[in-house]
Curated annotation (Swiss-Prot):
One Pfam family named in its UniProt record: SMC_N
Record keyword GTP-binding present: no
Keywords, ordered alphabetically: ATP-binding, Cytoplasm, DNA damage, DNA repair, DNA replication, DNA-binding, Nucleotide-binding, SOS response
Taxonomic lineage: Bacteria, Pseudomonadati, Pseudomonadota, Gammaproteobacteria, Enterobacterales
GO molecular function: ATP binding; single-stranded DNA binding
Protein name, per record: DNA replication and repair protein RecF
Organism per entry: Escherichia coli (strain K12)
Subcellular localization: Cytoplasm
Binding site for ATP: 30-37
Family note: Belongs to the RecF family.
GO CC term, one of those recorded: cytoplasm
Gene behind the chain: recF
Gene disruption: observed consequences: Fails to resume DNA synthesis after arrest of DNA replication (upon UV treatment); arrested replication forks accumulate.
Entry-linked HAMAP family: RecF
Domain of life (superkingdom): Bacteria
Length: 357
C-alpha cells in the first residue's frame, strides 16, 4: 500500500500543503530548517498519532494555531483508503478512516507500516533496551493479530502491580494481579522470541552486505532467567520488588542484544558504521514483513547523505529500490539523491514551509 496523496495543515512550519506522491521514490530537498523533515514527520504522525522529534504537542502544532490536520489516501492492490488525523493542543486526537470517526491510532499504524531512519535513530543501537523492545514489538504488532491487545493489557497490569507493591505486605496479596499478568508475559515473550528467531537470518544477511568486515550476532533476552517460570520469578523476588516499588523482572525488561565480533556494537562501530547497521536492520524488518504478509513498508529517511560515503549511499539506494516500496528521502541538495531518481520518482523543493514540485 502506498500513500498517493498527503494533505497537511498547521503542522510544524507548514501552513498548508497538498502533495500528489509517487508510489516509488519521493525526494524532499531544501536547506536546514526549510520544513523538509516536517513533511516526513507529518507522514510518520499520520501513521503513529505522534511525532518523532517531540512528544510535546504544542511544538508540533503551527504557532498560534489550535490543532493540526493531516489527511492521506492509501492505494492498495484492490482498494483506496482515506485516512485522517486531527490533534489539538490538549492532546485530544480524532482518527478518521473512510469518512467515519471513532477509530484508533493503532488502526492507522496497521494500515501504514513504516520504517524511520533518522540521525536520531542511533538509539536503536546505543540507547537503552526500550528502543530494541520497540523494534521487536513493531514486528510482533504487524505479524501477530493479538499482540496489541495483549501488550496493552500487560502495560495496564504492570502499572497496577507496581502501585500495589507500595501497599501490600505479603505476596498473597499480589496474586490477583499476577494470575492475569503471568500468561500475558509468557505469551508476549513467546511472540518476541519467535519473531527474533524468524528475522535473524534476514538481519544477518543484510548486515553482511552492509558491514562485511564484522561478524554480527543477535540475542533475544526475555527479561527474566532462562529455564525459570515467570510465576516463580515474581514470587521469589517479591520482597525486592516491594522495596524497589516496581517489578524488576519481566517482558518490560526484555532486550535484543546486538554484538559485532563479540563486543557491543556501540563500543565497536564508528558512527557511519552504526548508521549502516541501523539501515540494514530497518530494511531487514521491512523485507521480512513483505515476505510474511505480502505487505510493504513506507520508508522515511531523513538527511540521507549524512554519515555515508558515495559507495554506501549507492548500496542503500539499490536495496531500497529492490524492496519496490514507497520511499521518502530528505536531503539538503538534489545532488545527494539524483542517482536514486528515475522516471517514476518525484522531487519536491521545500523552502520556509512551502513545498513545490
Amino acid at each position: 500500500m502506498s500513500l498517493t496523496r498527503l494533505l497537511i495543515r498547521d503542522f510544524r512550519n507548514i501552513e498548508t500543503a497538498d502533495l500528489a506522491l509517487s508510489p516509488g521514490f519521493n525526494f524532499l530537498v531544501g536547506a536546514n530548517g526549510s520544513g523538509k523533515t516536517s513533511v516526513l514527520e507529518a507522514i510518520y504522525t499520520l501513521g503513529h498519532g505522534r511525532a518523532f522529534r517531540s512528544l510535546q504537542i504544542g511544538r508540533v502544532i503551527r504557532h498560534e494555531q489550535e490543532a493540526f490536520v493531516l489527511h492521506g489516501r492509501l492505494q492498495g492492490e484492490e482498494r483506496e483508503t482515506a485516512i485522517g488525523l486531527t490533534k489539538d493542543k490538549q492532546g485530544d486526537s480524532k482518527v478518521r478512516i473512510d469518512g467515519t470517526d471513532g477509530h484508533k491510532v493503532a488502526e492507522l499504524a496497521h494500515l501504514m507500516p513504516m520504517q524511520l531512519i533518522t540521525p536520531e535513530g542511533f538509539t536503536l543501537l546505543n540507547g537503552g533496551p526500550k528502543y530494541r523492545r520497540a523494534f521487536l514489538d513493531w514486528g510482533c504488532f504487524h505479524n501477530e493479530p493479538g499482540f496489541f491487545t495483549a501488550w496493552s493489557n500487560l502495560k495496564r497490569l504492570l502499572k497496577q502491580r507496581n502501585a500495589a507493591l507500595r501497599q501490600v505486605t505479603r505476596y498473597e496479596q499480589l496474586r490477583p494481579w499476577d494470575k492475569e499478568l503471568i500468561p500475558l508475559a509468557e505469551q508476549i515473550s513467546t511472540w518476541r522470541a519467535e519473531y527474533s528467531a524468524g528475522i535473524a537470518a534476514d538481519m544477518a544477511d543484510t548486515c553482511k552486505q552492509f558491514l562485511p568486515e564484522f561478524s554480527l550476532t543477535f540475542s533475544f533476552q526475555r527479561g527474566w532467567e532462562k529455564e525459570t517460570e515467570y510465576a516463580e520469578v515474581l514470587e521469589r523476588n517479591f520482597e525486592r520488588d516491594r522495596q524497589l516499588t516496581y517489578t524488576a523482572h519481566g517482558p518490560h525488561k526484555a532486550d535484543l542484544r546486538i554484538r559485532a565480533d563479540g563486543a557491543p556494537v556501540e563500543d565497536t562501530l564508528s558512527r557511519g558504521q552504526l548508521k549502516l547497521l541501523m539501515c540494514a536492520l530497518r530494511l531487514a524488518q521491512g523485507e521480512f514483513l513483505t515476505r510474511e504478509s505480502g505487505r510493504r513498508c513506507l520508508y522515511l529517511i531523513d538527511d540521507f547523505a549524512s554519515e555515508l560515503d558515495d559507495e554506501r549511499r549507492g548500496l542503500l539506494a539499490s536495496r531500497l529500490k529492490a524492496t519496490q516500496s514507497q520511499v521518502f528521502v530528505s536531503a539538503i541538495s538534489a545532488e545527494h539523491v539524483i542517482d536514486m531518481s528515475d522516471e517514476n520518482s518525484k522531487m519536491f523543493t521545500v523552502e520556509k514551509g512551502k513545498i513545490t514540485d
